[in-house]
Amino acid sequence: MTNFSPREIVSELDRYIIGQKDAKRAVAIALRNRWRRQQLSDELRDEVMPKNILMIGPTGVGKTEISRRLAKLAGAPFVKVEATKFTEVGYVGRDVEQIVRDLVEVGITLVREKKRAEVKAKAHQNAEERVLDALVGTTASPATRDSFRKKLRANELDEKEIEIDIAETGAPGGFEIPGMPGANIGVLNLSEMFGKALGGRTRKVKTTVKDSYELLVNDESDKLLDNEQIQREAMAAAENDGIVFLDEIDKIAARDGGIGAGVSREGVQRDLLPLVEGTTVATKYGPMKTDHILFIASGAFHVSKPSDLLPELQGRLPIRVELRALTKEDFRRILTETEASLIRQYKALLETEGVALDFTEDAIDALAEVAVQLNANVENIGARRLQTVMERVLDDISFNAPDRGGDTLMIDADYVRKHVGDLAANTDLSRYIL
């Protein structure tokens, strides 16, 4: 779990997302509260519940991007799900408890990678011995092994082809029984059982010495790991530090009428209630409590309103944050100030062909202006509009780049307007460029 301060979390998010100070502060405080809770005594820790967040704002202003960046910062099990993918229990589709099972799987992967890093030195040592076995055999004299070991460490044998045995890591056995959610619960994993009895299945792999190390280090790491301990730690991490980002929650808000799809939508909300409030979900690693999982919900709420959500669900999302629509200045900053800005991306892409791009200040102004106009006249899709505009402006250059290696191309305001200005000015035509 990360121990960044709220200020550090916000400044990290500032590198990738322009504006939206309130939303950044809310998620930063929520993330820091996870760490604060871990410092409490056991009896008080159980009483402190996460304050779930509802982010409201038009599309393309940074709601999903905040969640993506938060996932990398959190250092905790994190899943992002679209609320529209789930259906009420009894309908065809995924049920909401799958969210928790996915969270546990993410936890398992996180803990396994952490444990692998801890035993990497020992695993690398064992992998080297196995490479030597493949090169000179197990019966070679110590002198021969030492001579090959020196060559191996000097990278003289990197291209030599060897055959190694790798543990079989096939898909887990078992199957789901209809009507019994929980994936593999109560189903004997026969392949695992027989695998242990017979010492595990292996497969032969032909590879070079250089490429064999990654396979062998992973194989040796897994031998040194205790799977039961990994599962216990992953379950604890998912229960106490897990974060679930529920995107598009406005799409399951039942609108007036309550007929047709609206009924199923309300059913999904009712299924979400116990999950957000705190319940126990059966997973294939054992029961998992959801009391301390942090839920961050987000939606554009173009058609529906937050008040269209079930009152009980609204009550379980106590922190409301509104994200504002983007202005021309925001678009300018998105193009130039973010860590991996669009202009930087396109410059890097075309540099691979030997073409240097140079954007003037008035070109950046023009790009922002066109994006604002299109959003106002056609459909407001926020920062995503910039991708449409950039693609349109650089269409000819991208197409002809292989023939223009070594050129330096200047993009100015006139060039931008020539390629998109006329379309942006005409609402009817601009509809056809997204």
Swiss-Prot record:
* Subcellular location, record wording: Cytoplasm
> Under the GO molecular function aspect, what terms does this record hold?
ATP binding; ATP hydrolysis activity; peptidase activity; proteasome-activating activity
Which Pfam families does the entry mention?
A: AAA (PF00004), AAA_2 (PF07724), ClpB_D2-small (PF10431)
What the entry lists under SUPFAM superfamilies is as follows: P-loop containing nucleoside triphosphate hydrolases (SSF52540)
Q: Which residues form the signal peptide?
A: none
Where on this chain does ATP bind? I18, G60, V61, G62, K63, T64, E65, D247, E312, R384
The protein's matches in InterPro entries, at most eight in alphabetical order, are given as:
AAA+_ATPase, ATP-dep_Clp_protease_ClpX, ATPase_AAA_core, Clp_ATPase_C, HslU, P-loop_NTPase
Cite the SMART domains for this sequence.
AAA, ClpB_D2-small
| Alphabetical list of PANTHER family matching this protein | ATP-DEPENDENT CLP PROTEASE ATP-BINDING SUBUNIT CLPX-LIKE, MITOCHONDRIAL-RELATED (PTHR48102), ATP-DEPENDENT PROTEASE ATPASE SUBUNIT HSLU (PTHR48102:SF3)
According to its UniProt entry, what is the function of this protein?
ATPase subunit of a proteasome-like degradation complex; this subunit has chaperone activity. The binding of ATP and its subsequent hydrolysis by HslU are essential for unfolding of protein substrates subsequently hydrolyzed by HslV. HslU recognizes the N-terminal part of its protein substrates and unfolds these before they are guided to HslV for hydrolysis.
Q: This protein is called what?
A: ATP-dependent protease ATPase subunit HslU
Give the organism the record lists. Sinorhizobium fredii (strain NBRC 101917 / NGR234)
Per the record, the gene is: hslU
